[in-house]
Amino acid sequence: MVAITIFAVLAAAAYGGMNSIVRAQIAVRESSDALDAISRALARFEKDLSQAYSRSARGAYGTIDAAMVGDSNSLSVTTMTIAASATGPSATPVRVRHTLAQGRWLRTQTAALDLAPNTPETARLILDDFSAVSLRYLDAQLREHDRWPPANATLEGVSPDTLPRAVELRLTSKRFGEIRRLIALSAGRQ
């Protein structure tokens, strides 16, 4: 009887220990997956900005959009993408838009740079686990702006094709707190 009681106590302790290990493993896996999702989203954003191309685009109804148009929670930019063709890879300019609102980060890309009405877009959710976001833009004189092109861009002689020197992204993750990235644009150093 004593042996059975000792065995039962040891079995209960072993079960409790195994249960704790499994719960810890699940928590680590969930944190790892969440961090991986943030890393992929930031890498996609950095890749788009590193391929920024200093060329304005024509909107669907004939409006001219600057090479980059952005505010505190969205950004549209002309980027160069590598496309496969019969003669080999070639660089093609496309328009990419990042929209960060209501805890969702969407990346939208159009197949053409100068749009016609009803040009199809490809939208993809790249992150959905954050509580706050802000974008800021750094000009050639190292001044910060909440929008790009700056409100006084025409008075300062800034061309619509001018890109900022850098873009700062501040993202508040529900799990990891504030994440801040400052991305330099090579095309912005003119």
What is the predicted role of each segment?
Residues R180-A184:
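Edge beta-strands of extracellular beta-sandwich domains
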Residues G188-Q190:
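Extracytoplasmic/luminal low-complexity segments enriched in Pro/Gly and acidic/polar residues
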Residues M80-L163:
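Intrinsically disordered, low-complexity regions enriched in Pro/Ser/Thr/Gly and acidic residues
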Residues L169-R175:
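Short, exposed beta-strand-loop hairpins at the edges of beta-sheets
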Residues A11-A116:
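Extracytoplasmic beta-strand-rich oligomerization domains located immediately C-terminal to a leader/signal peptide
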Residues P164-E168:
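Short, conserved beta-strand segments of beta-strand-rich sandwich/propeller modules, principally
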Residues M1-F7:
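N-terminal signal-anchor/signal peptide hydrophobic helix marking the start
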